[in-house]
Amino acid sequence: MRETPEREEEPGTEAPCAASCHAQRILQTLNAYRRSGTLTDVVLRAGGRDFPCHRAALSAASAHFRGLFAAGRPERAAAVVPVGPETPGTAAALAVVLDYVYGAGVRLRAEDEAAAVLALAERLGVAGLREACARFLEGRLRAANSLALRRVAAAFSLASLAERCGRVLRQAFVEVTRHADFLELAPDEVAALLADPALRVAREEAVFEAAMRWVRHDAPARRGQLRRLLEHVRLPLLAPAYFLEKVEADELLQACGDCRPLLLEARACFILGREAGALRARPRRFMDLAEVIVVIGGCDRKGLLKLPFADAYHPESQRWTPLPSLPGYTRSEFASCALRNDIYVSGGHINSRDVWMFSSHLNTWIKVASMHKGRWRHKMVALQGQLFAVGGFDGLRRLRSVERYDPFSNTWAAIAPLPEAVSSAAVAPCAGQLYVIGGAGQDGVNTDKVQCFDPKEDQWSLRSPAPFLQRCLEAVSLEDTIYVVGGLMSKIFTYDPGSDVWREAADLPSPVESCGVTVCDGKVHILGGRDEHGESTSSVFTFDPGTGQVEAQPSLQRCTSSHGCVTIVQSLSR
């Protein structure tokens, strides 16, 4: 019978799992030898306990022992090698490390044990155990231990654990601040936590109370940190009654002279609303309150229909919410602005004197006192808690007329007229004064004049002319700088009243006029308007003064131009 030759294995092939199973059996045998003291050639001593081991196994798994047992080192022949520090915790941690080295797996029971094992594994250079400890800690992460684990993450550069700790701190801020670890934070850590715009708090009162709880934990030593911490509390978002009863009446704050400017800023915001311009008046990202952009009325694509809609847009969620329609919506080319979180709309075609207020609290439109002079193509802005209706057109001529509205007395009064009559100009308040930029003059010719009103002196003056001659302009102010767009210009221009200097800020993707412009979340938003073909658009762009970048945003719900556009703070749960 002919023998069949044995089939030769191809080089490099092996039975499935043969190598890994073989390695596992070797580790299991070595671990059994370690536990029984068989063939061990070194003893590790930690916390009063001895651990017989094999130098070869330790050297294979640990960079520290590999170097320690290298040829020429005096410790190479040592029978006993101490592993510090000499504490019971070190012994327990070393037991876990050796189980890992010998393939017995990692069994962790508590966060402090995992932190001790992690520290020892780092010292001994045991690769892989670091990741196992990090995964265990991530699985045990809770609000109660988030601050402690954040310190562990920082100490050992565990990026994933640090990110998860930060998320828990933001999402469970109120619960975190109730634990003792919060009271032991360093001032820098408390300030950084309070400053986070993404804290998930329903009310800013929770942030204020956390700051004061930390200070009162050791008031004599910490009262000097009050101003620094209070800078990160958004005092204008507190309920006015709470501010009076809990903040201004607080003895620690009364004794802190450095805190007084912050309290005065909050008071100004209660009186003036967003006009005060305080960054601390912006709601945090995940509050129920948020800045929303309100778009009111306007003309359709061809300019034939007057749109009745009023809608609020939340940029963070990109969600539109309908509001009650503007009464008398058949008017166009009216003016709008926000004052103390209410929206005012005045005038409109043809020659209307009407003024309506949208109460954001009552969610309804209320008619208030009419202007003395009917007008459209004018502008209206808020300055020092009052409204100013500026210039415009009455059907016969462009107007020099300026009227001031006092919301407390519900009355309009004429003030010093414009040096030069204009309509369709850009108007913006900035640094306590009123600026009227460009527009169409009495002869119908566009002007580049910048007319400045000082309310203290009830007097107008001229400033440096604009670098353009345009009408149908819009302007807003942000941090003592005026931003001008529209007039079918392809650029955004800035004007600094302090230096009386004009600059080009950015290029726009496409020119528009009679657009809506407002400031929301620290950015300039440009909404709708007419393009170079005279048609209304639905385009939306944002300009970030910090980066100088213009970005396209989701379009409006419909094409519109000559519309009202303001920013208010609104509850998102409505």
Swiss-Prot record:
It comes from Mus musculus (Mouse). It comes from the Eukaryota. InterPro entries: BACK (IPR011705), BTB-kelch_protein (IPR017096), BTB/POZ_dom (IPR000210), Kelch-typ_b-propeller (IPR015915), Kelch_1 (IPR006652), KLHL35_BTB_POZ_dom (IPR030601), SKP1/BTB/POZ_sf (IPR011333). The keyword ATP-binding does not apply. Keywords: Kelch repeat, Repeat. The lineage of its organism: Eukaryota, Metazoa, Chordata, Craniata, Vertebrata. PANTHER family: KELCH PROTEIN, KELCH-LIKE PROTEIN 35. Residues 146-248 form the BACK domain. This is Kelch-like protein 35. CDD domains: BTB_POZ_KLHL35 (cd18265). Residues 40-110 form the BTB domain. Kelch repeats lie at residues 292-341, 343-385, 386-432, 434-480, 481-522, 524-570.
